[in-house]
Structures are given as structure tokens and as C-alpha cells.
Amino acid sequence: MTNIRKSHPLLKIVNDSFIDLPTPSSISAWWNFGSLLGICLALQILTGLFLAMHYTSDTATAFSSVTHICRDVNYGWVLRYLHANGASMFFICLYLHVGRGLYYGSYLYKETWNVGVILLFAVMATAFMGYVLPWGQMSFWGATVITNLLSAIPYIGTSLVEWIWGGFSVDKATLTRFFAFHFLLPFITSAMVMVHLLFLHETGSNNPTGIPSNADMIPFHPYYTIKDILGLFMMITALLALVLFAPDMLGDPDNYMPANPLSTPPHIKPEWYFLFAYAILRSIPNKLGGVLALVVSILILIIIPLLHTSKQRSMTFRPISQCLFWLLVADLLTLTWIGGQPVEYPYVIIGQLASVLYFSIIIVFMPLVGLMENYLLKW
């Protein structure tokens, strides 16, 4: 008799995805982040669901309802800080996952990569709308500044912004719709994760060498289930340390003040995981130019497969490309730092140089170095 997990219509899908899935024997811990992201998404949906039971999306009571969750709901503070810091863990895992894809040439699985980029946009949109919900000062002004950027779109800009706001400023209508979309998007994201995995399992996983590994595969369970559980424990430990010892470390103190449309905070800035894009936005003096640079800084990931000139897939055996990759990482860290600084000398010029370098590395230097390495290897 066939094993039920191999014959049952539903269990068969689970079996082929997580149990008997043929996996390259050489994949390193950098391949753990997919499962960690899945767990992050599940955690966010779960904590978010319980928070939504106590939250009210009305400008008069939103701030008070968050206070009520933290003070009066049983373990409400744990839920709230797990959700807020869970978002930070989500983005740490996301950026490491994308970085892994760039380093090892995983972007050559174009369908998987493109769905992944759409997923990144979906998670960013969800996080932005979630930041608005507590209705603190930074929530209100962050929403005002970022949505107002759309007014730079020629001809339809102003109408578009007012349509998104549901009025002439960020107000009750804006908060209500942001809550609705913040609740909805994670479920859409979950469906897209299925598509992401569907495309991935069509080709199988890449591996650190970038060489096809069809001849050397092992079952996902028990080898990689155990390996992923180690990564999970490490992430949960880091998250709990953050939640229980420094829950506000990554937040903004201004958000503990209720939203006040008549008082602007001295430095309006988004959450830390958007600071690199915010720095690119601010480094261009023109409004439309800044908005375009902001969008392109993420959208550029879509064209990375087209910019691959090397005859090797992975960077494992390409030292010059490795140097460029780590320069890109350092540049992104610099942009993140600049995004949190005030708009004054020397931060402005550093931000502008880092922004130019960011686009130059991806569009110019990496393809050229790929060609150069081909030439050096006489290929």
C-alpha cells in the first residue's frame, strides 16, 4: 500500500514541497531564509489578527486603543511588540534573502525572482500602512510625506493623492482604508508565496557553486528541516531578546505622542528598513526625480537577470565581483545611516555620492566586471 502522504491529494502537495523535495546537498545556511520568511509571515498574521481584535481604526480612538492593548489586554504588550519587532526581523530576513539571491545568481530563475520582487513590494506596502495605524506623530507625518510624493506625478498627481487620502489631508478616511489594506495584504502575500514556491519547485534550488546539482540531491526532510529549525531558534532568540529587553530600540520616540496635524516633528523619517530608499529619495533635489529614484532603487532588481554578463552563475569563484558585492552592501548600510540623519552638510553630499554609487555598481560596474572576468578566464 502506498504511503498516505504520497497518495492523498492534499498531503501529496505538502510531501512534494517539504518532505520528499529533492534538494542540493551543498546548500549553506544562506538558504535558510526562505523558511524563516514563511515563519515571519505566519507570526505577523497571527499577532496581527489578535491585535486587530482590540484595535479601532478611528482617528479619535486609534492611539488610545494601542495604549489599551499594551496596558489592559492580557499579554497585549507582548503581541504589540512581537508584531512591531517581527516586522524588523521580517525585513532583516528579506534583505539577507535578496542578498543571497544576488550573490549566488539565483536571479537567473527569472519567474521565481520576479515574483519575489513583487512580494518585496507587497511587504513594503504592508509595513508602511502598518506604521500609520498607531496614529502617533511619526505615523501621521510619515503617511503625509510619503503619500504626498505621488503628487509629483504629472497631471493626475494631486487628484491621485486626494483620492488615496479620501479628503484633503491624511484623516479618518485614510486611517480606515490603511487598516483595511494592512489587514488584507498579508493574505494576498501568502497566496503569492505559494506562486513563488511553485516557480521555485519547477526548477529546484540553486546552490553555492552555481553549477547544476541534479546528480547530487538529498530529500528535504530530515536534513534541511533540522537545519531550518536551527535557523528558526536563532531568529526566535533574537526576536525575543529584542521584544523583552529593548522593545522600542528600533522605533521612534515621536510615535509615543498622539498625532497632531498642527505640530511637525523636527525630523520626519520612516522605519529603519526604509531608510536606504528614503536617503536616495532625499538626495535628489527635484521632487519627481526623487520619487522616480526611490521607485527605481527597488524596481532595479527586476532587470538584474538582464545585466548578468558572466559565464559563471555564482560569485563563489569570482573575487572581483565579490568585492563589488560587498561594496554594494557597505553602500546600502551607508544609505541607511544617512536616511536617519538631518538634511544638512555633510550628510547631503554623502547621501548623493552613495546614491550614485548604488546605481553605478548595479548598472555599470557589475556587468563590466562580469565581462572582464570572462576575458581573464579566456572564456
Swiss-Prot record:
Recorded name of the encoding gene: MT-CYB
Residues annotated as transmembrane: 33-53, 77-98, 113-133, 178-198, 226-246, 288-308, 320-340, 347-367
Binding site for a ubiquinone: 201
UniProt-annotated binding residues for heme b b562: 83, 182
Lineage: Eukaryota, Metazoa, Chordata, Craniata, Vertebrata
Additional comment: Heme 1 (or BL or b562) is low-potential and absorbs at about 562 nm, and heme 2 (or BH or b566) is high-potential and absorbs at about 566 nm.
GO molecular function, one term: ubiquinol-cytochrome-c reductase activity
Membrane topology, as annotated: Multi-pass membrane protein
Reported function: Component of the ubiquinol-cytochrome c reductase complex (complex III or cytochrome b-c1 complex) that is part of the mitochondrial respiratory chain. The b-c1 complex mediates electron transfer from ubiquinol to cytochrome c. Contributes to the generation of a proton gradient across the mitochondrial membrane that is then used for ATP synthesis.
This protein's name: Cytochrome b
SUPFAM superfamilies referenced in this protein's UniProt entry, alphabetically: a domain/subunit of cytochrome bc1 complex (Ubiquinol-cytochrome c reductase) (SSF81648), Transmembrane di-heme cytochromes (SSF81342)
Organism the protein comes from: Cnephaeus serotinus
GO biological-process terms attached to the record: mitochondrial electron transport, ubiquinol to cytochrome c
Homology family: Belongs to the cytochrome b family.
